[in-house]
Structure formats: C-alpha cells, structure tokens
Amino acid sequence: MMNRRRFLYYGTAGVASPLLALGCGSQRRGLPATAAAPAAAGATTPFAVTPGINPDLKAHGAIFERKIHKVGDNIYVAVGWSICNTIMVVGDHGVIIVDTGAEVQSAREVAAEFRKITDKPVQAIIYTCFHSDHINGVKGHASADDVKAGHIVIIAHETLLANVTKSGTIGPILGTRTAYNFGGILAAADIEGMNNGTGPLNRRGGEATFIAPTRTFADRLDITIAGVAMHLVHVPSEAADEIAVFLSESGILLSAEVIPAQTFPTLHPLRGEAYRDPVDWYRSIDALRRFKAAAMVPSHGLPVIGADNVEEILRNYRDAIQYVHDQTVRQMNHGLTPDELVEVVKLPPHLASFQPWMLEFFGTVSQAVRAIYQGYLGWFEGDPIMLAQLPRVERARREVELMGGRDHVLAAASKAFEDGDPQWAGELATRLIRIDRDDMPARRLKASAFRKLGYAQINAIWRNWYLSAARELEGFGFDPVLIQRGIARAITSPDLVAALSARAFVEGFPARLKAEDTLDVTMTVGFRFPDVDEAYGVEIRRGVAQFEEQLPEKTNLTLTLDKATLERIQLGQLTMRDAILGGVVQVSDGPPTEVARFFGYFEMPFTTPIQLVVR
C-alpha cells in the first residue's frame, strides 16, 4: 500500500476553508452507451475472473472528491467535476477562469458553484493547453457573443488552434485509441468506483463546446486583467502548447499539466501522440521553480501549499524525468533495445519512495523508456531480422505448428492461466487469434487473461486498455461500427467544426484517397469559399491527391460554397447533392455528375470498423 503521509500532507495542509479533468477526456461526448455485460469472462468460459480495482488506485480517487478549494485570498479551484480542474482568480471587478473542463454541463455546475463565491463577471479565460478537458467546457463560463463583443478575452498559446484541428488527419484511429485509453467503451460494471489517474471519470454524453482564442502569445505574456497581474509562460510538457500562470502579487503558481495529479507523468500517452521531449519537460519545470512560488495549483489534483513543499515536488519531478531520460539514453548508447531498456531503467529508491507522487497511476516509467528510444532512434533496433519479417499470420501459423498445433497451444495457454501466468496465457492465445480471428475459445481465454491483468493494475490507463481489449475479444456489447459513429459525433460538435478552417477541410482529402481506384485517374477540382476569401484545389494524379494552396488554373470541376455551408455538410445537416440542387453550392467548369465521381475516390472517415486486438 502507498505511503499516505505525503498523500494527506500535500492534499490538505494549509488549504483554507471552504475547500473542489483527452485530448483528452475519459468518456468522450457521443460515444455509444455500451450494453450491460458480465464484468468477467466467466459467464461463457471456465476462466472466471473476479472483478476489482487495485486498492491503491481506488484510494487515489479520494483526491478527486468534488470540492472547491480556496488558495490564498482570491483563488478557488474546482476539483472533481471533470478530469481537469477549473480555477477561478477573483480580481477587483471581474474574474479569470483558467481551464474550463471537458464538457459544458459540468462546466455550468462549476460556474454555479463559483457564483456562490462572487457574482463578478468573467473577464478572461485561459486555456493552458489544447487537450479537450481544458477547453471543451468553455460555454459553461462564457458565451460566444460576449467573446465576440470583447467583454471576455480568451488567452492561449499561439499554436493551440492548430493543435485543436490538426489531429483530424488521424481522427478515426486516434479516436478509437482514445476511447480504449480512457475507458470510453467499458461497461458500467468496469468503471464503477474508478478514476482516470489524473482526475475523475468524465460524465458520458456531455456536450463539447469551443470558442477560439482571441489573444495568443509565443513564449511569455505579462498582462493585468481585473487588477490581477499575471505572468504567462510557455512550458512544453504534457502538451506542446502548455502554458503556466504565475500570480506575482500572491506568489501562487498555476502549474497547468506540468505537474500531474500525484502520479508519475505520462511522458508518452498510450493513445498516441507526437513525441513529448523529456528534456523540454524538465526544463519547463525548472522555469517554474524559478518563480519560487508560495503555493501551486495544478490543473489536475489538489493544490500544494508552502514554498518548501512546492520546491520539493517540482525538484523531484524534474529529477525523475531527467533520470529516466538520461539513463535511457546512456543504456541506448550501450546498445540496449526497448525490451532490454525497460528491464534496467527504474527510478532510484529516493525518487520511487516519493509517494504518492511517483506512483504510476497515470504514466509509467516503462512506456516513457520505450518512447524515448523511439524518439531518438525510431522503430529499427539494429537487427536486420526486423527488416523483412514474415507476415504476422504466417509467422503465427508456423509457430503454432512448431508448438504442436492449435489444440496443444490452447491447452498450454489454459494451463498458464490456471497457474497464475495471464501474460503468457495471453501471448499464446494471440498466436491462435492471428490465424483465426473467430477462434472464440482462444479469444475468451485472452480476454480473461486481460481482465486478470487489468483488475490488478495500479495504472488507470493500463487498466482501461486491458479491459477495453477484453471487451473487444469477448464480442458481446462491442460494436466497432457504433464506436466509429460515436467517435465521429464526439469530434464533430458544431463548435469544433466551426473551428476547422476551410483550408483544413480541403487539406484532409489526400490521406483519404483510395489509391487503388485512381492509379489511372487524373482529375483536378477547385474549391472557392467567397465568404472567407479562400480558394484551394485538389489534383488526383495516378494514386496521389495533391493539395493546392491556390485555385488551380485549369480544373475539371470547381465548387463554390460558403464556409457556413461547408460546416452544415460536415455536420450531416445537409448533403452535397441537396446543396447543389438547392443552389447553395455552385458547380462550374464541369458537369455536376463529376462531383459524385470526385468524392467517390475518397473514403468517408469513421465508416470503417476498427478492431485493435482481434487481428
């Protein structure tokens, strides 16, 4: 069990009374409700598994109790309504909101709690990063009209808007992995009493909202709002666009996600993301240390009171991150590969014992080590046997044959499970599933192995992956088609679609081209958006679709439409056919029949079922 001394000390010491997290929310808006299903595979297999939650992980959830914490004279932090905290800084004649939560319903509840403290109007909102749990509750605190009228300024790093929209290129796979990562497809029985390591579970079905920033900066912004002097600094860490806020008058640091919620940080997320450079991260922590803050309010977890406590936490975090980075690089330079590195790179005792802050509720050392290797050297480990490996199915077929055949391997996997070795049981069953995806005895055995591993995990994200994979393997209550539809709804709310530029829409075509259908096709289509004074083109050229930054001189077809019409089409409120027939999309330079031919060369996103494990 964890050492509770630090858990209690940093969580409550000195916090004035009264005392309250994608991207990346847990259950994203619009994911399909999953049918009630047995929590274990034992209903249809002899490999019964007793459901449960690791006791330390369960106890960790106590820090996310819904509560308003007061820090200093004028700062209030709402913990427990969303994965991300929402912070209110009260000024002379208005308030500043820092981070808004993952969806609008919980944000409205937080706003109502804040109004019990003060009725001063919101004058500014600060997004500390682009992750959905920080930005998608914004309309619970502000209206688009007030922002447009200049009554409220929204401040963020200059790259935030691009970060919000750029992940659409890999939306289907990233959305699927995010659903697994945060338990979005799990049955109610498997999330009851759970937290997500860095915050509580988000409510399912919440509405994602967004208002674009109205003021951005690159490295540093010194600004006074409502009489509150603030120093905003760019601190790349959990997100590349992360910013922290130092309130110089009170000496209080709003540390964003640079320091997570009493857990080892996620130096690389399992859902997938661009490389997070650990060197940037610990240097960002050093930048925060230079403020010598009297208190620290993170965007996840509880506030920390006392300059010595703040320094101890910041120092140990930066040392842990640097230690993992440096020792991974050192051992890489000895020739070690990722599988070998995770066996030797561990936190030293003095850092590992800094509990609960270094417990692996959200991030882990091992996944950080693998990411560091990949970040420096890529996928190739140096053994040419990796260069032209046998296809996965053929390799599995040969291995199973060598092991004595399917029945022998299944029996060995069953024995491994019964002997308390679920990892080996799962590895053996994987070979059988590779050969035959419909081998249900093997699938149920692997699912039981994953449940055994998952229920024991201290890490919430690993638990989610194990149990989500088990659900896929078991098959009942799991519909990959519905999951894709739910993901599409989750990332195509009206506000998020409005934030997507016309250029981004057209730029998205190339990665969806069905190359096999266009190897003998050449076709150029132009797109005009007169209301935003933009025009682009797409040239299909024998299996490649090239984006053109300007309207091509010669086109086979040109479509003219307003950005607002494009948004209605993207949201499914209007079909392209009806838009053309209704005159809101004009077709020139070619017959309207060519429109269907052009769009037919591209895959529609979120229409292909994705299975991550049964393959």
Question: Residue ranges of each PLM-predicted region?
Answer:
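Accessory terminal helices/loops
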Residues: R28-K58, P172-R177, F182-T198, N202-R203, ...
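C-terminal motif of bacterial Sec signal peptides marking the signal peptidase cleavage site
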Residues: L22-G23
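Metallo-beta-lactamase
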Residues: K70, G94-I96, A102-V104, A162-H234, D280-K292, ...
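Active-site metal-binding motif and surrounding structural segment of the metallo-beta-lactamase
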Residues: I68-V71, D92-G94, V104-I154, T216
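Conserved beta-strand hairpin/beta-sheet module of binuclear metal-dependent hydrolase folds
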Residues: E65-T118, A244-E257
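Feature captures hydrophobic
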Residues: A35-A40, A412-K415, D421-E427, R434, ...
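N-terminal secretory signal peptides and thylakoid transit peptides that target proteins
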Residues: M1-V15
